[in-house]
Amino acid sequence: MSSETLEFSGCNFFRIRLAYSILSGRPIRIINIRKNDDRPGIRDFESKLIGLLEKVTNGTKVEISRTGTQVIFRPGMITGGVVNLDCGTERCISYFLEPLLLLSPFCKVPMVIKLKGVTNAPGEISVDGMKASWLKVYNKFVLNDEKLDIKIQARGLKPEGGGVVVFTAPIVKTLRPVKRQQVGKVCKIRGQAYVTKVTPSLAYRMIDAAKKAMHGYISDVYITVDQRKGDAGGASPGYGLFLTAETTEGVIYQAEAISRPKGESGVPILPEDIGIEAGHALLQQIYMGGALDSSAQILASTFMTLCPKDVSHFLYGPLPMYSVHALRHLKQFFEIEFKMEDFKKTLKEEEADLKTGSADKAMVTAVGVGYSNLNKTIL
């Protein structure tokens, strides 16, 4: 792979550009970052992400222009190790976990990362969501999963945060190719109604509403209450509902709904509405289908690219825009192309007639680039 500098424009896909730059060893230049904005340049959370990636690598050089609208990133080797970081309250901790998950198998020493900030936020995947659905996909590519964990020591909601998450991951020499096209049938729904610094009766109202929203779909629904007090509850009051559906093949879909952050304008969301919203979001995710949750498609695409030179298949549901752009970035950084087939066309006639959710599923096939962990010390 050539080491010429790749040039990008704009602030979108910032974290995957940095992660892919480190994995491929190719320097990048990002220009015109919010150049027409009232506050041009990179935001505080983006500079924190750069700082975090500098801590888990060795020899990374970053140049940020005076206005902050241009970043030149020259990647180093991935070392991993023990790192503590305060992520601030602008973005959810999952924003920082995403690049870490992509880099973690290829470190010199296993990662132990302690992140402080917001664990659950509206409009973003939560740390719970990553723990439930991403780690399941991670396991398929990395066999040694004994150290793999995302521990939520304290929950933190916006605007104050106060959550604490510890991420640990194993290291491997190479990933293994994966063939996943069986989805199976949904056999159980599990969930967590979390309340921090508010009365726990709200949790039971959310649970009731969610069960009513999913009534008639499946009987095995079990939702626990996660009530956090003191420091474990973070610094802001709030409540939300996180749901997962597991299939007979071990595929996990996840969905979440959360209350409005304290001090935000607008009508407060009732616990009943949150329960209904989470229930419907989960049913929508199940309908979309695929052999993984749609948010984890980027993880599967990246790991399929970094596999040994062998074929991997993965059945995706409809691809969100973020996944499509991730595939384009993989082509730019690793010169890899994915073969995508309409899943309906690959089925036999009697299978195609079964009502198995969305018709827009794609069978994604790729041959890995033969990536191996050169940082790992061999005993």
From Swiss-Prot:
GO terms for molecular function: RNA endonuclease activity. It is found in: Nucleus, Nucleolus. It comes from the Eukaryota. Belongs to the RNA 3'-terminal cyclase family. Type 2 subfamily. The keyword Nucleus applies. CDD domains: RNA_Cyclase_Class_I. Its main location: nucleus. Pfam families: RTC, RTC_insert. Part of the small subunit (SSU) processome, first precursor of the small eukaryotic ribosomal subunit. During the assembly of the SSU processome in the nucleolus, many ribosome biogenesis factors, an RNA chaperone and ribosomal proteins associate with the nascent pre-rRNA and work in concert to generate RNA folding, modifications, rearrangements and cleavage as well as targeted degradation of pre-ribosomal RNA by the RNA exosome. Does not have cyclase activity. This is Probable RNA 3'-terminal phosphate cyclase-like protein. Keywords: Nucleus, Ribosome biogenesis. One of its GO terms (cellular component) is small-subunit processome. Part of the small subunit (SSU) processome, composed of more than 70 proteins and the RNA chaperone small nucleolar RNA (snoRNA) U3. GO terms for biological process: endonucleolytic cleavage of tricistronic rRNA transcript (SSU-rRNA, 5.8S rRNA, LSU-rRNA); ribosomal small subunit biogenesis. InterPro entries: RNA3'-term_phos_cycl_insert, RNA3'_phos_cyclase_dom, RNA3'_phos_cyclase_dom_sf, RNA3'_term_phos_cyc, RNA3'_term_phos_cyc_type_2, RNA3'_term_phos_cycl-like_CS, RNA3'P_cycl/enolpyr_Trfase_a/b, RPTC_insert.
